[in-house]
């Protein structure tokens, strides 16, 4: 036995209700331009949206009465996804590890790599690792850290100042 298809809009994946999915009445309506149209029955709000060739989208379901906006739902969904994806854009954290006795040329090599990371909009965690008796000479590690920060100041800015965490001194540098 075949079931008759109803003329119902497909269920959207997110919890945003649109058009006929909004069952509560009355609703507070905001026009496409952003002006308040007041609290009106849902049927009347749907009619206004249809007349404008747009959708009635429930934007604040937790309010009493719920707030609905007359807008193009496809565009709204696209902008929402775009905003969500741009927020978690690309930023990763890369690490360069140094020691208090690291030579100048080795430091420059590590700094060049850190500059590449910063140019690619990644954050850089600079770590100076201390072993054994090096813990008695933390100031040498701080000198190395300050040298790296000074060189990287052109392409990045210090996000967290150098801090001692056990046997490590850590500093975060973000791209400018």
Curated annotation (Swiss-Prot):
Q: Which family does it belong to?
A: Belongs to the IF-3 family.
Q: Which NCBIfam families match?
A: infC
What Pfam families does UniProt report for this protein, alphabetically? IF3_C (PF00707), IF3_N (PF05198)
Indicate where this protein resides in the cell. Cytoplasm
Q: What does this protein do?
A: IF-3 binds to the 30S ribosomal subunit and shifts the equilibrium between 70S ribosomes and their 50S and 30S subunits in favor of the free subunits, thus enhancing the availability of 30S subunits on which protein synthesis initiation begins.
Please name the GO terms that the record assigns under molecular function: ribosome binding; translation initiation factor activity
Q: Among the record's GO biological process terms, what is one?
A: ribosome disassembly
Where does it mainly reside?
A: cytoplasm
**InterPro entries per record:** T_IF-3_C_sf (IPR036788), T_IF-3_N_sf (IPR036787), Translation_initiation_fac3_CS (IPR019813), Translation_initiation_fac_3 (IPR001288), Translation_initiation_fac_3_C (IPR019815), Translation_initiation_fac_3_N (IPR019814)
According to the UniProt record, one GO cellular component term is:
cytosol
> What is the protein named?
Translation initiation factor IF-3
Q: How does it assemble?
A: Monomer.
Keywords (alphabetical) are: Cytoplasm, Initiation factor, Protein biosynthesis
